[in-house]
Amino acid sequence: MNKWFIRIPLILLGLLAVLTLLAIGAFRITNPTNGSLVSSGETRRYLLYVPESYDPTVPTPLVITLHGFAQWPANQAGVSQWNDLADEYGLIVVYPAGTGFPMRWRTSGAPGSAADPMQDVTFISDLINKLSAEYNVDPARVYANGLSNGGGMSFVLSCKLSERIAAFGSVAGAYSLPWSDCNPSRPLPAIVFHGTADPIVPYQGGLAGRSGFSLPSIPDWVDELARRNGCDAAPQDLEATGDVSGVQYMNCAGEVIFYTIAEGGHSWPGGGYLPKIIVGNTSHDIDASRTMWEFFQKHPLSGEEN
């Protein structure tokens, strides 16, 4: 009998190990990447999309789009559908991979800690360097955007890599970086999307899902971003379309536009559907990626900045 008391835990541990390996294997099959580099001592991976129309003699915009927590590059490609815009407008699009299992971006943490955002900031900077060496990337037109945790990371890049990122966008962003840690060399133009019924990152702020992690009110956060970008305090309303309303902050050093999706969930407006039972409603009254690209085109880095 005593032997079974010893064997049963060992059998359970063995089964757990097998299930873990199977999960990792399945994850790798569904998480294709086609590029890698070593950054800060870590092997980092990414999924790159270069349209057939790419001309190496023409400086080409680079769009960096970042997946959410527990997601991956191929998932972000399917949700955001940036590849369609790459084909239409001749963009290079890269989907970097976060770290850990589940995958995530390090968006807050003490310097030198395991959660220090600078490790991921350095990775993105190294990635820009690598792609710029391999392709004719226009340094004045490098843009970042992301979903959820990836939206939070795009904000981190605006704070820590403002000399290289021309503008940023965020969808259902989880903004955990304290404002005291955001000191960009220039105010970055920003375009933000968020649903009022987001079950993961609450529109009015509070705890993120079941994590117990406290996040700011999104309207208040955007107001503070606009204030820091030197905008007038009172924004102007944009024309409403279906369940989407928007405001544009005026006379900014870095333009800020904020779209609110009434009853919208934790999803990418106009993009691929995510399970409604988990994320809530996905609006198709606005195409977040296309709207971002229209915004980004108006905001290249100036000659003094790149």
Q: What does each of the following model-derived ranges do?
A:
Residues 4-62, 74-80, 85-88, 116-120, ...:
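A domain-start/cap signature at the N-terminus of enzymes
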Residues 60, 67-72, 264-265:
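Active-site glycine-rich loops that stabilize anionic/oxyanionic intermediates
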Residues 65-68, 95, 260:
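Structural cue for short, hydrophobic secondary-structure segments
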Residues 68-72, 77, 101:
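Serine-hydrolase catalytic-loop signature spanning alpha/beta hydrolases and amidase-signature enzymes
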Residues 97-119:
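Cap/lid segment of the alpha/beta-hydrolase catalytic domain
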Residues 113-135, 156:
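Alpha/beta-hydrolase active-site loop
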Residues 136-148:
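Alpha/beta-hydrolase fold nucleophile elbow
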Residues 192-194, 198:
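Short beta-strand/loop motif that positions the catalytic acidic residue
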